[in-house]
């Protein structure tokens, strides 16, 4: 393989020949590659290399001598979590109700609910879920193909560590050969797409449970299939709210639910229910608001740039440095956002706070209006994240409604307050506010009529009995502890149905009163509520550290549930036991602890309430030191995902309760007993006293310092009472560093039962490490730690720390005393891992390739640790990234689609109703804005703006180069013609027939592309040799290109140019028209990728990548500036320009490659858009020759793999040698080949139609065929790596082998290899080429990755995205147009030009820049630029410079 050959080639520079041969022999057939593919004598040859001794490719050009320039930057990603310095982040800790809760205690606050599905539907969903579970990992072909972790001796490590440094993932993680038939392989490959993505370790069971819940727990996905006939509104409401029977709809009203926001929806009043429904699509990645704010630190406010994107509020020290977020606030855990009332009169309220379940953040805006806008935006996000799912549903049984009354909470609408009994257990009372902007009185009258005769109202009227029940001392419920339960009076009607809602109502104003009768009137937090799957309210007590999309919410029924036996008793923040940090202290199970009786709104309880509790006067019981409150990872997974519910009769909590003297045992339910899995032995001390244990260990000889470190680390909990907490933290860090190495906390996925793994930890260490891991990175209990490694993050200086790997995250935490760096990198953002040489002698490097971001470099002390880390990450990537469910890759997407379908169906049914009326939303919005109430609209298209220009435009596309450079513009222009515009392509004359065949106007551009290609191949793109020959031979060629481009663009309204043309930006300036750029390779400055012309074999990091763009721009402009400026003065009538004046980096840019192939870097501004490939599909009408069709059919019949080989119209010195190598490689790999031999078509001295050597029957030669048809017939493709050809082969979903020759081909070869969907050939010879062919056609890992990528690319619509981007950016492009005024005062012009040149800091002779008088061409005004009318003064020039600098702010040179 190419990467294998590259590894040996690079090793040869530092190893002797003997060591290299040993490396080959020791590796041997460990890659499961047949014996015949071992390297031959030609392994170091390259038949495509130029024969000239002075030839220099771009990989050996000037960029290669600038190694690791700028060092490795401080990487942070969007996910970097860095503990702030003391001056900005410590303030506010300890101010909330939850700052003393650990992760387990927070999780125990989670109150799950009964599933709303009927019992028979439960069983049916369970059967469906079990039937759709993925196969066991041992049966998974993709995972089974992964190699076993090899147990190597130290000697093996020393012998193999060096030559494996440069191995790619395809080499150190190869597939095992499959024994299946090709047909079985094909079927099983297709079957993988239908399987749900597997996470690793113990999370597999969790994932299975989640999937089954998603299928059955969501009302929108049950019984909502589209029917052929119209469905009545009553039937649709029955389906959505899951009523037992269809109920007649008495009335429906558009209304707004009033909570922290004003939510638009509809109220439906049926015979038995009052229902509310609103659709709120979640915006996971949209930027809601940006701007500067002050954030409160310890002693002062610090100013940062804030970005509210999705549900994360990030802030930056420098807005231009998107790689270095100061910190991120996850609003999924936020509780409230509010403006702080200013106590000083006359001063504006500019301070606002955001409260999470851990702390309170304080911010200060520049104005009161800005503060309110930020609060409104954050409140919207909080509401979205706290609502269960993508729709708000409230179903209130009419018989539960106690009171309907008007409210004056809003001045601009009629507001109705509905008080309703929540459930039959506690008789808690909820309040909901609904605002009506139309027909409010009608709604109020109907509601009053409907509830006038309900049983609650009658009882309250006749008996004058307070509906709030008397409470009993003890009663079990679905809380994790014992709670107060009401004793229902005999004359109180029984609640047969509970209120069901996906969000919590507003807090009741009676919560804080001391009367015990007011306990029932609570803020919906004392008593557990049933929601969709996992209930989370807007109150502080209900905020939990878990993601809003982590578990699917489901609309709920009853109020009681049965907890799993793995759950621990809850603990309140005010619990006496919560005051200590020791894990050995807990409450006696028999006491009425604060967790057992106290509500989570206890912060507002009065002194009499607190003293009224009997357990206040008792000391907390202390359990034995051996009992740990933390759970095993398996238990934690069940704990975090236990959403099992029942919809039948009440099922009480099973708790181990020891009655005390103060407790009336007669009130305990008879069913209360010990849990089934309670082990009596666990209540006894498992370990002796820490000091005696130390004496015992001291009796043994101390052989290793790491042994003591490990022992002390195991006893850290027991020694917590002896050492100070802060000192213990330093001790744990040091002891961990002393132990070093790596640790695995469970068996890796995909291993066979007899496989072994280094460093496996026992259960005690694994549990403690998992707890520490979740504490460091604030992960939920469901996040299971799998492995950890000690390594150094390579920056300017190595940053020593610890790598943590779980099923979903790759994390790093610095252990350096002065560093607080943390990295939290989702596994889904990792593309690949590459082994590299270490930066330091004796260290071994690992590069993490990340989507849209520069690589992360880590150094390990041993190659063994580096290899295990790489294999661990790759196994997780295989599980989570490439085994996708057919319907959706994540639950979030499927939830969004289900909610949208539900919304559409309900809207269709509502439109059939006569009561449906339109409301003027603008009036409501203005009124709400006056009161500063944030709005959420029901219509997801309410914010859509049509950017399409009213008049058709003449759009010219200017490009030079090969056929691959022209083809994307033909596809774009065809779509522009459909939009009603006039399209024209300006390029080389040889492409005119092809362009005009598609009905597109054409204009010729001079220049011979064959000559340009020749010097590119011989010298490399824009190397010193290229520039030298271009200056000596192609000055006239550049003049012809510029002049012909100027003529071809006359009459254009918009110009789209490939920047390689070099003339377009100047033509657009002269014509004063909007200018866009479009290209097939990265041309905009970024740290994620190097410039396409400066790709090296090694990953050099973000500093090098960014430098290549600056250096290239400087060299490129220096080479052409003199000639271009001369042409500007002579033909365009423009003055000289420079890089800063052109503002090229501020121009809108369209990249016509897929975002799945080249993910947009995080540091690209929003005017740069990766649109997707602009494919030109010509295969629909293509009829293949009969002999080609017969060749393909015969290959399938013979069960032989088909490969395409074609390197385009390249120029090489020895085409015969290349042909012979291709023939020999095809025969050796035992495949069939379709050959497109164009490597001697240009500048050849003989007829290229005659083959240099005879072709065997296994090879079929073609002249041309559409790629979109041909690649569908192939199993793999080999080509030169042009953007269009690469896109075509990747869209077909086949592995791609690339042998780059010049230009951007090296870049796409690297991308294909990084994604794991192909191979980058460094050399072409029989040994390397044949091995690459065999791997591309037999590696199931590569085949499946390519297939998945092809599916994603086929979903793109690049031309349409490009057109919409043009529409959106057209106004911005117009603002960059420089207006010119006709010259009429030569002295003023000279004077103005002189000022401009002084601004650039250049000494020039003013007399040397007189313009040559030229007659303007038709349609062109020969103007000269002016900075203003009349005479100039120094002040005007200063203002001009200031405005210019502001316009080029963050993305200029």
Curated annotation (Swiss-Prot):
Catalytic activity: a sterol + UDP-alpha-D-glucose = a sterol 3-beta-D-glucoside + UDP + H(+); ergosterol + UDP-alpha-D-glucose = ergosteryl 3-beta-D-glucoside + UDP + H(+)
Residue ranges annotated for the GRAM domain, each copy included: 235-282, 771-837
EC class name: transferase
Low complexity bias spans: 513-524
Membrane topology listed for this record: Peripheral membrane protein
Protein transport in keyword set: yes
Ranges annotated as biased composition (Basic and acidic residues): 1-12, 22-41, 91-103, 112-129, 153-163, 183-193, 200-216, 527-539, 547-570
Protein name: Sterol 3-beta-glucosyltransferase
Organism annotation: Phaeosphaeria nodorum (strain SN15 / ATCC MYA-4574 / FGSC 10173) (Glume blotch fungus)
Gene: ATG26
């Amino acid at each position: 393989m190419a990467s294998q050959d590259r590894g040996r080639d690079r090793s040869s520079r530092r190893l002797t020949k003997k060591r290299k041969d040993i490396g080959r022999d020791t590796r041997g057939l460990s890659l499961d590659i047949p014996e015949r593919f071992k390297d031959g004598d030609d392994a170091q040859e390259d038949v495509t290399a130029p024969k000239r001794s002075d030839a220099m490719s771009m990989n050996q050009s000037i960029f290669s001598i600038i190694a690791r320039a700028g060092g490795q930057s401080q990487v942070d990603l969007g996910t970097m979590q860095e503990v702030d310095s003391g001056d900005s982040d410590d303030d506010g800790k300890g101010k909330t109700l939850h700052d003393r809760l650990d992760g387990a205690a927070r999780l125990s606050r989670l109150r799950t609910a009964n599933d709303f599905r009927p019992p028979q539907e439960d069983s049916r969903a369970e059967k469906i879920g079990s039937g759709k579970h993925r196969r066991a990992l041992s049966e998974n072909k993709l995972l089974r193909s992964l190699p076993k972790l090899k147990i190597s001796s130290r000697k093996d490590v020393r012998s193999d560590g060096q030559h494996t440094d440069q191995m790619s993932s395809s080499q150190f993680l190869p597939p095992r050969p499959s024994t299946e038939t090709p047909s079985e392989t094909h079927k099983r490959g297709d079957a993988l797409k239908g399987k749900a993505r597997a996470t690793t370790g113990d999370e597999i069971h969790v994932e299975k449970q989640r999937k089954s819940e998603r299928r059955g727990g969501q009302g929108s996905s049950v019984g909502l299939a589209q029917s052929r006939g119209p469905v009545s509104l009553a039937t649709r409401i029955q389906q959505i709210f899951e009523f037992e029977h269809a109920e007649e709809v008495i009335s429906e009203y558009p209304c707004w639910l009033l909570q922290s926001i004003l939510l638009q929806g509809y109220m439906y009043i049926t015979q038995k229910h009052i229902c509310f429904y609103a659709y709120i699509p979640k915006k996971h990645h949209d930027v809601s608001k940006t701007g500067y704010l002050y954030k409160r630190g310890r002693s002062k406010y610090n100013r940062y740039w804030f970005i509210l994107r999705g549900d994360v509020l990030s802030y930056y020290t420098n807005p231009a440095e998107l790689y270095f977020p100061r910190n991120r606030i996850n609003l999924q855990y936020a509780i409230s956002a509010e403006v702080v009332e200013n106590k000083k009169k006359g001063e504006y309220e500019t301070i606002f706070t955001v409260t999470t379940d851990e702390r309170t953040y304080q911010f200060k805006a520049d104005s009161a209006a800005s503060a309110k806008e930020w609060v409104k935006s954050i409140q919207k996000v909080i509401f979205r994240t706290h609502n269960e799912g993508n729709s708000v549903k409230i179903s209130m049984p009419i018989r539960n409604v106690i009171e309907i009354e008007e409210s004056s909470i809003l001045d601009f609408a009629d507001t109705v307050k509905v008080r309703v009994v929540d459930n039959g257990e506690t008789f808690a009372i909820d309040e909901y506010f609904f605002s009506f902007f139309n027909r409010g009185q009608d709604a109020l009258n109907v509601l009053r009529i409907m509830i006038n005769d309900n049983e609650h109202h009658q009882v309250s009227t006749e008996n004058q009995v307070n509906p709030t029940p008397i409470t009993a001392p003890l009663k079990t419920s679905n809380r994790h502890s014992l709670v107060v339960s009401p004793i229902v009076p005999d004359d109180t009607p029984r609640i047969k149905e509970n209120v069901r809602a996906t969000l919590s109502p507003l807090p009741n104003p009676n919560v804080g009163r001391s009367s015990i009768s007011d306990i029932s009137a609570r803020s919906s937090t004392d008593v557990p509520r049933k929601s969709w799957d996992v209930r989370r309210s807007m109150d502080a007590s209900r905020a939990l550290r878990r993601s809003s999309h982590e578990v699917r919410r489901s609309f709920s029924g009853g109020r009681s549930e049965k907890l799993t036996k793995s759950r621990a008793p809850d603990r309140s923040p005010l619990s006496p036991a919560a005051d200590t940090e020791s894990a050995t202290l807990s409450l006696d199970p028999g006491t009425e602890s604060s967790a057992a009786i106290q509500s989570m709104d206890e912060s507002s309880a009065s002194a009499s309430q607190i003293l009224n509790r009997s357990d206040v006067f008792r000391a907390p019981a202390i359990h034995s030191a051996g009992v740990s409150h933390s759970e095993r990872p398996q238990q934690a997974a069940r704990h975090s995902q236990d959403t099992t519910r029942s919809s039948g009769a009440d099922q009480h909590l099973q708790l181990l309760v020891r009655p005390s003297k103060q407790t009336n045992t007669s009130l305990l339910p008879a069913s209360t007993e010990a849990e089934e899995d309670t082990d009596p032995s666990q209540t006894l001390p498992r370990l002796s006293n820490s000091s005696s244990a130390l004496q015992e260990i001291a009796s043994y000889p101390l052989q290793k310092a790491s042994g003591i470190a490990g022992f002390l680390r195991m006893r850290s909990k027991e020694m917590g009472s002896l050492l100070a907490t802060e000192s213990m933290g330093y001790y744990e860090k040091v002891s961990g560093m002393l132990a070093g190495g790596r640790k695995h906390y469970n068996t890796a996925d995909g291993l066979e039962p007899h496989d072994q793994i280094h460093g496996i930890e026992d259960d005690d260490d694994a549990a403690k490490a998992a707890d520490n891991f979740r504490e460091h990175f604030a992960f939920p209990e469901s996040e299971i730690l799998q492995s950890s490694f000690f390594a150094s993050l390579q920056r300017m200086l190595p940053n020593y720390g610890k790598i943590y790997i779980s099923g979903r995250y790759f994390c790093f935490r610095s252990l350096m005393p002065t560093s607080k760096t943390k990295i939290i990198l989702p596994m889904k953002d990792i593309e690949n891992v590459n082994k590299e040489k270490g930066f330091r002698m004796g260290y071994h490097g690992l590069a993490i390739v990340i989507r849209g971001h520069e690589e992360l470099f880590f150094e390990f002390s041993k190659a063994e640790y580096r290899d295990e880390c790489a294999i661990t990450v790759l196994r997780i990537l295989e599980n989570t990234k490439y085994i996708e469910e057919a319907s959706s890759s994540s639950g979030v997407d499927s939830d969004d689609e289900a909610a949208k379908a539900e919304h559409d169906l309900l809207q269709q049914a509502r439109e059939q109703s006569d009561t449906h009326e339109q409301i003027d939303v603008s009036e409501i919005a203005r009124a709400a804005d006056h009161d500063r109430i944030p709005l959420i609209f029901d219509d997801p298209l309410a914010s859509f703006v049509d950017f399409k220009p009213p008049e058709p435009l003449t759009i010219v596309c200017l490009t030079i180069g090969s056929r691959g450079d022209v083809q994307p513009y033909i596809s774009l222009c065809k779509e522009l013609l459909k939009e009603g515009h006039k399209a024209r392509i300006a390029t080389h004359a040889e492409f005119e027939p092809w362009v005009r065949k598609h009905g597109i106007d054409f204009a010729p551009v001079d220049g011979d592309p064959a000559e340009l290609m020749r010097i590119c191949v011989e010298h490399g793109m824009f190397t010193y040799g290229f520039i030298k020959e271009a200056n000596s031979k192609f000055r006239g060629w550049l003049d012809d290109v510029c002049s012909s481009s100027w003529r071809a663009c006359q009459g254009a309204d918009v110009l789209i140019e490939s920047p390689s043309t070099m003339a377009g930006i100047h033509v657009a300036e002269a014509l004063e028209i909007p200018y866009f750029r479009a290209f097939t390779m990265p041309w905009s400055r970024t740290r994620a990728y190097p410039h396409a012309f400066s790709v090296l074999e090694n990953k050099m990091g973000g500093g090098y990548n960014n430098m290549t763009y600056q250096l290239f721009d400087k060299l490129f402009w220096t080479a052409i500036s003199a000639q271009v400026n001369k042409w500007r003065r002579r033909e365009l009538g423009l003055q000289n320009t420079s890089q800063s004046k052109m503002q090229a980096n501020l121009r809108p840019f369209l990249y016509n490659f897929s975002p799945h192939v080249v993910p947009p870097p995080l540091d690209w501004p929003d005017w740069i858009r990766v649109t997707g490939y602009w494919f030109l599909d010509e295969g629909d009408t293509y009829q293949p020759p009969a002999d080609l069709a017969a060749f393909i059919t015969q290959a399938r019949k013979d069960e032989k793999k088909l490969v395409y080989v074609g390197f385009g119209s390249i120029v090489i010195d020895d085409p015969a040698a290349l042909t012979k190598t291709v023939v020999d490689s095809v025969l050796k790999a035992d495949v069939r080949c379709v050959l497109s031999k164009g490597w001697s078509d240009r500048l050849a001295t003989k007829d290229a139609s005659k083959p240099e050597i005879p072709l065997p029957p296994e090879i079929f030669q073609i002249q041309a065929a559409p790629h979109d048809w041909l690649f569908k017939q192939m199993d793999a493709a080999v080509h030169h790596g042009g953007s269009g050809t690469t896109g075509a082969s990747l869209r077909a979903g086949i592995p791609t082998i690339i042998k780059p020759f010049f230009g951007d081909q090296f870049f796409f070869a690297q991308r294909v290899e990084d994604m794991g969907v192909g191979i980058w050939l460094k050399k072409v010879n029989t040994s390397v080429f044949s091995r690459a062919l065999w791997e591309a056609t037999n590696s199931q890992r590569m085949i499946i990755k390519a297939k998945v990528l092809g599916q994603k690319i086929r979903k793109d619509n690049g031309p349409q995205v490009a057109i919409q981007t043009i529409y959106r950016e057209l106004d911005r492009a117009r603002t960059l147009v420089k207006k010119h005024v006709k010259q009429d005062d030569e002295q003023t012009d000279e004077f103005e030009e002189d000022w401009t040149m002084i601004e650039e800091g250049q000494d020039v002779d003013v007399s040397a820049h007189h313009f040559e008088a030229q007659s303007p061409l038709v349609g062109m005004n020969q103007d000269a630029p002016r900075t203003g009318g009349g005479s100039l003064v120094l002040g005007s020039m200063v203002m001009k410079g200031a405005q210019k600098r502001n316009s080029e702010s963050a993305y200029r040179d």
